[in-house]
Amino acid sequence: AYGIVSNVTDEKSVQDMVDEIVEKFGRLDVLVNNAGISQKVTVEDMTLDDMKRIFNVNMFGLFLVTQKCMKVMRAQKYGRIVNLSSVSGKRGGGIFGGAHYSASKAAVLAFSKNLSREICAEGITVNSVCPGLINTEIWKSLPKEEADKVIDGIPMGRPGETQEVANAIVFLASKEASYITGEEIDINGGSHMD
């Protein structure tokens, strides 16, 4: 593993990260856009700064990283881009986020489909995964009564595991997914079905 610290909201930081990857490895085959933040607040109590902060990371950061990485992928005529959205971006609402979070994740879905149409003929696929409730520290911090209520809305009767999300990402990043692009993969135990 090779780690690089980057601020996805800063264009120079993103370009420096991409340059370092290409210098070290000679190519860039897979991008997983996983940076994201959330905030639990109602629309009435939300400020414009709250909205901007969420979009700066969740959508504009994703845009910057994608734009810089896709230039490398286009030159090599190969690439896999997997963007993390959310079930909240498809149905609105959420346990841990407000309307600004849902809107930013819906924007990720629209951006991904549009980009897929722009570059799929060049050997680059663009897909999204839309996790629902996943067994993380935030989930574990919910009071039992609230957690039970959430689980009642999941037909599979449990939160997803991080490995289940990772499995979908690994598949979409693989050569086996070479004819899949512009898709949204739901990983939510049946809590939202299209």
Residue ranges with predicted function:
Residues 71, 113, 117-121, 178:
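Alpha-helical segment proximal to the catalytic Tyr-Lys
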Residues 5-16, 48, 163-164:
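The beta1-alpha1 cofactor-binding region of Rossmann-like NAD(H)/NADP(H)-dependent oxidoreductases
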